[in-house]
Regions:
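Hydrophobic alpha-helical transmembrane segments of multi-pass integral membrane proteins
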Residues: 1-392
């Protein structure tokens, strides 16, 4: 046997689910995302009458502090190891983080509101600690802000629960709205870092570029939006901020040459998802002017941008960190197309009053299908060892 073959690494046998953060959290996020549609239907049908969180409040809470925070956890626990060269939780500590997240999903469907509040506020703090130690040990100051954002998310989810429990006098929805702005900021930061890079690496001659002024305006406008929501500014001010943000993010996307990525699914899904951020901001401006309801803008961000960006990143990082080629076949294309169609149906189909209920139902089914496909396709990828035999 030639030496080159004799010394090739062989994948280790056994369960690899707890080897690195992306593995359990991407799997949990996809399964939860697919089946949460059933839980939403059960709530809507009155089959969970004693659930602490009900209706649209549960729906929004679980989109942010169930699905989205799980993907953020998987991404950060993996990325921080790469950024710092230091260990992040694996094995039993990683399992404990996953159990804490699962407990939060269960408790909001029970009557135990105080316990649900404590657990859901604790998870972002635990995640901040998990990434904070390696970041600080490596003095990776560029990414310290993630620690702060996670602590802000913890404070916001706690505020929502305290409001619901009657401990503070603010609308429970305020914490969710501000948390959505924080998630938008995270997507804007990471999108600006990775989408141009992935575009130029994956599409020869794409020529994706960045402009310092556009970058500052794009990120600054999202911070302004957070402050506008926090202080409940006048509608004219909100209109100006959201229009400026839409223009800034639209210019940013144009610099990335999206039209050149059509033949590369692992790249175009990121561009398509980012386009929904621009749509979200434009629809928020229309809502501030009283021309549309606010839910259209919310779902452009949650279904289109968050759904598309997380699905694209979960696919890309799962393949890259398990030693697989960064390619996509019909399975991945179907997942990406389903979540984008779900967004279009939910946002634009719902604008016709007669089609609103049908658009909600159809988009929910399309969403569940997209993430169900991911769970089925990537179960073996996420639970088995790397193909190249490397750790992780």
């Amino acid at each position: 046997m030639p030496n080159a073959l004799r010394h090739q690494p062989v994948p280790a046998a056994g369960l690899a689910l707890w080897n690195l953060g992306f593995r359990p959290f991407y799997l949990l996020a996809s399964i939860f995302s697919a089946f949460s549609v059933l839980a939403w239907a059960a709530q809507y049908s009155g089959w969970l009458p004693y659930a602490y969180l009900q209706g649209s409040l549960w729906h929004g809470h679980e989109m942010l502090f169930g699905y989205t925070i799980a993907v953020i956890a998987g991404f950060l626990l993996t990325a921080v190891r790469n950024w710092t060269g230091r260990a992040t939780p694996e094995g039993a500590p990683l399992m404990a983080l996953a159990v804490l997240w699962v407990a939060g999903r269960v408790l909001v469907l029970t009557p135990f509101g105080a316990a649900a509040a404590a657990v859901n506020a604790a998870f972002p703090v635990a995640l901040a600690v998990a990434i904070g130690f390696p970041l600080m040990q490596a003095r990776n100051t560029r990414n310290y802000f993630f620690i702060g954002l996670l602590l802000v998310l913890s404070a916001l989810v706690l505020a929502s629960h305290l409001a619901l429990l009657g401990a503070i006098e603010v609308p429970p929805q305020l914490g969710l709205r501000l948390a959505l702005d924080v998630v938008l900021f995270i997507m804007a930061v990471m999108g600006g870092r990775v989408i141009p890079m992935f575009t130029n690496n994956g599409v020869p001659g794409a020529g994706a570029t960045r402009h310092l002024l556009v970058e500052r305006l794009a990120l600054g406008s999202v911070l302004a939006l957070f402050l506008a929501d926090l202080f409940d500014v006048q509608l004219a001010v909100m209109t100006a901020i959201t229009l400026a943000a839409a223009i800034a993010h639209g210019a940013r996307l144009a610099l990335w040459r999206s039209w050149r990525t059509v033949g590369t699914p692992l790249v175009w899904i990121l561009h398509a998802a980012y386009a929904w951020i621009v749509i979200h901001l434009a629809l928020r401006a229309l809502a501030a002017m009283g021309w549309l309801g606010g839910s259209y803008a919310i779902h452009a961000l949650t279904v289109g941008a968050i759904g598309g960006l997380t699905l694209g990143m979960m696919t890309r990082t799962a393949r890259g960190h398990t030693g697989r080629p960064l390619t996509a076949d019909g399975f991945e294309f179907a997942m990406f197309a389903l979540v984008q169609i779900a967004a279009a149906v939910r946002v634009f189909g719902g604008m016709a009053p007669s089609a609103f209920l049908a658009s909600v139902q159809l988009s929910g089914l399309l969403w569940a299908a997209a993430f169900g496909l991911y769970a089925v396709r990537y179960w073996p990828v996420l639970t088995r060892s790397r193909l190249d035999g490397k750790p992780g």
